[in-house]
């Protein structure tokens, strides 16, 4: 099994390269010249996209082919003060350059919309904002020229006093999404509400790939399903038919990995990854899985990736393939 590692949004090694620079709504509102204020937002967005390109070049130098883009590339995107603003007109060239670089270097990019993007909500206003947010994320992927292998990952959401009703709301609304959005979605188990098995059921009903978060599973699972590997054959099936950018090669399933910050704070993410639980999981799924992509959700970002690779070199049964991939 070939394993590729990736990280989320920020690099600890590339200085002055934040892809999430912003302007507060209060600061925007204080600017008397609205046109000038909008131009400032657009300049910040272009800088964020340019910094993302810098990060991709850093990734290429270190053989990192898996990367999650910041959801904050466009500041104040979706804010009620800017309902008449279409930033994509100005950002087309910058996004095209970013996506072109990713395609040229066979990089797998994704988004993970923020926690307020929930389709299971009982509130109409939250739902409307969630739908707009998903549309915006997909529009960015489209502007990059990326096909449907570039995904947006979300959770099923809260249970709002009735988990079954919340799940049903999610399913109905998910099925009603425009095809261009629905085909780019993946669903992930969360750390408090919807377990891996419950999320998998929703994925099977909606025909959507599942991203298994093994840390979330550790802190949120049914007693009889403590070992998430029993779900893996079904999770693999949710990825059937998914192909890599511009090819007919099967898109590898993706998992998330993080380590608990402490015993008392088991849900929060630590700075680095404890390789033990990850390698135990990977060894157990290897016979069924030709390739898997692992997104590292650690506070130290790419430093955590490099540290994990360093520890992997000490494992006798693992073959290092690159600075960010290995075989077992």
Label the model's feature ranges:
Residues 112, 213, 294:
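Conserved, mostly hydrophobic/aromatic
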Residues 218-222:
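Short active-site loop/helix that positions an aromatic residue
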Residues 134-206, 215:
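Eukaryote-skewed repeat-based solenoidal scaffolds used as protein-protein interaction platforms
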Residues 108-117, 149-155:
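Glycine-rich, often proline-containing surface loops adjacent to acidic residues and nearby aromatics
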Residues 1-108, 117-131, 135-146, 176, ...:
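Alpha/beta catalytic barrel-like cores
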């Amino acid at each position: 099994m070939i394993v590729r590692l990736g990280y989320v949004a920020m690099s600890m090694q590339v200085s002055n390269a934040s892809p999430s620079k912003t302007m507060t709504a209060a600061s925007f509102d204080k600017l008397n010249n609205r046109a000038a204020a909008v131009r400032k937002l657009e300049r910040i967005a272009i800088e964020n996209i340019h910094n993302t390109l810098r990060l991709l070049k850093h990734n290429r130098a270190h053989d990192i082919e898996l990367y999650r883009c910041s959801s904050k590339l466009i500041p104040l995107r979706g804010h009620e003060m800017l309902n008449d603003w279409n930033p994509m007109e100005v950002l087309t060239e910058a996004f095209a350059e970013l996506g072109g670089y990713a395609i040229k270097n066979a990089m797998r990019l994704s988004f993970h919309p923020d926690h307020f993007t929930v389709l299971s909500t009982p509130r109409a206003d939250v739902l409307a904002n969630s739908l707009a947010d998903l549309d915006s994320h997909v529009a960015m992927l489209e502007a990059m020229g990326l096909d449907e292998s570039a995904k947006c990952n979300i959770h099923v959401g809260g249970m709002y006093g009735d988990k079954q009703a919340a799940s049903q709301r999610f399913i109905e609304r998910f099925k009603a999404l425009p095809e261009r959005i629905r085909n780019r979605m993946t669903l992930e188990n969360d750390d408090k509400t919807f377990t891996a098995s419950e999320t998998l059921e929703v994925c099977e009903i909606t025909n959507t790939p599942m991203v298994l978060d093994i840390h979330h599973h550790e802190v949120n699972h049914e007693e009889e399903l403590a070992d998430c590997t029993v779900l893996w054959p079904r999770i693999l099936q949710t990825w059937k038919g998914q192909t890599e950018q511009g090819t007919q090669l099967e898109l590898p399933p993706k998992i998330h990995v993080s380590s608990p910050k402490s015993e008392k704070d088991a849900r929060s993410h630590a700075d680095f990854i404890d390789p033990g639980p990850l390698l135990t999981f990977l060894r157990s799924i290897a016979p069924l899985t030709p390739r898997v992509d692992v997104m590292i959700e650690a506070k130290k970002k790419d430093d955590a990736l490099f540290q994990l690779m360093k520890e992997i070199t000490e494992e006798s049964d693992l073959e290092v393939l690159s600075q960010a991939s290995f075989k077992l």
